[in-house]
């Protein structure tokens, strides 16, 4: 992944947070929120097998959290608490609740994905109420330029809770959590525009290996690994936002989808860890809401 240049761009920002006595009046803020990352999965928290040198560098010159606890074990409610500062006793979002009466079991339906792909009104989760105060709106009032890049999950397209309406001047990424289960989507959202990714094809996350495919043959998984890896596209937008606001106070909220399932990474990076950790003998061939994966441990490490 294209982390080297991104980390280099962010290090000056991170360095500011580590020197409280030298902080400017309005220091830039970069908040990283990883998705389903284990506490010990980064080098700065003691991990020895998975290599995370660039994140470790950010941690060394910034702030790491050792006593920050999530308010919920699910994506949307935990994000709601972070965005609003409310614990789950008062939070508006308390579950991964779909819109239009869709039930969890329905999420395995290809027709559901096709419908949300064709009509954005069927995309996304239960929205925050219009006018909700968030860290984005608070920072805007303080004179900051704000961006959220990554996964949103707190209100679908055409609702009152699109990121641009919740305090973020710029948004790029996944509006809907279910579509974020693929790292090779054929579209992402840029503000309120659905942007199709040339070279990637429509592939619902309930897709499976072709009938008769050999689950131990890496080529059987080719259809799930397309041209553009969504994280790389997000890194480019992050760098652009940082560059364009170099002279302005900004807050960047990077809600990366890594390393949430489906565990996917570019093949060369996965094979690096296959060689390092050893061949795996148990592929995931029926991942429920996620794609099949030949080397789940190595793919997780590569992410």
Which stretches of residues belong to each language-model region?
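Active-site segment of extracytoplasmic enzymes that catalyze sulfate/phosphate-ester chemistry
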Residues: 39-134, 138, 144-147, 158, ...
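Bacterial N-terminal signal peptides that target proteins for export
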Residues: 1-7
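Non-transmembrane alpha-helical segments in soluble domains
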Residues: 34, 56-60, 83, 136-140, ...
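Active-site-proximal cap/lid insertion segments
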Residues: 23-24, 34-50, 66, 70, ...
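Loop/turn elements at helix/coil->beta-strand transitions in domains of secreted/extracellular proteins
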Residues: 25-30, 61-66, 140-147, 166-169, ...
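Active-site glycine-centered loops adjacent to acidic/histidine catalytic or metal-binding residues
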Residues: 151
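C-terminal motif of bacterial Sec signal peptides marking the signal peptidase cleavage site
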Residues: 17-18
């Amino acid at each position: 992944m294209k982390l080297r240049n991104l980390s280099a761009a962010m290090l000056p920002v991170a360095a500011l947070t580590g020197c409280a006595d030298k902080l400017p009046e309005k220091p830039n803020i970069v908040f990283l929120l990883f998705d389903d990352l284990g506490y010990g999965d980064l080098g700065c928290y003691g991990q020895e097998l998975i290599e995370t040198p660039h994140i470790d560098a950010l941690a060394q010159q910034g702030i790491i959290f050792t006593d920050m606890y999530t308010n919920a074990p699910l994506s949307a409610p935990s994000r709601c608490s972070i965005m609003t500062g409310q614990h789950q006793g008062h939070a508006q979002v308390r579950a991964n609740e779909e819109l239009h009466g869709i039930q969890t079991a329905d999420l395995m339906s290809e027709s559901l994905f096709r419908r949300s792909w064709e009509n954005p009104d069927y995309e996304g989760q239960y929205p925050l109420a219009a006018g909700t105060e968030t860290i984005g709106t608070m920072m805007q009032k303080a004179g900051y330029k704000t961006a959220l890049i990554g996964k949103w999950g707190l209100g679908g397209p055409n609702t009152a809770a699109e990121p641009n309406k919740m305090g973020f001047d710029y948004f790029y990424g996944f509006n809907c959590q279910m579509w974020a289960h693929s790292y090779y989507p054929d579209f992402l959202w840029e503000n309120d525009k659905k942007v199709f990714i040339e070279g990637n094809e429509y592939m619902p996350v309930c897709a499976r290996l072709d009938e008769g495919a050999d689950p131990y043959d890496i080529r059987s998984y080719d259809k799930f690994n397309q041209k553009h890896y969504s994280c790389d596209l997000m890194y480019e937008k992050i760098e652009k936002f940082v560059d364009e606001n170099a002279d302005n106070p900004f807050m960047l909220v990077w809600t990366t989808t890594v390393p949430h399932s489906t565990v996917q990474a570019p093949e060369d990076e996965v094979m690096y860890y296959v060689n390092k950790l050893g061949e795996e003998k148990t592929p995931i061939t029926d991942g429920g809401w996620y794609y099949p994966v030949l080397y789940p441990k190595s793919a997780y490490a590569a992410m």
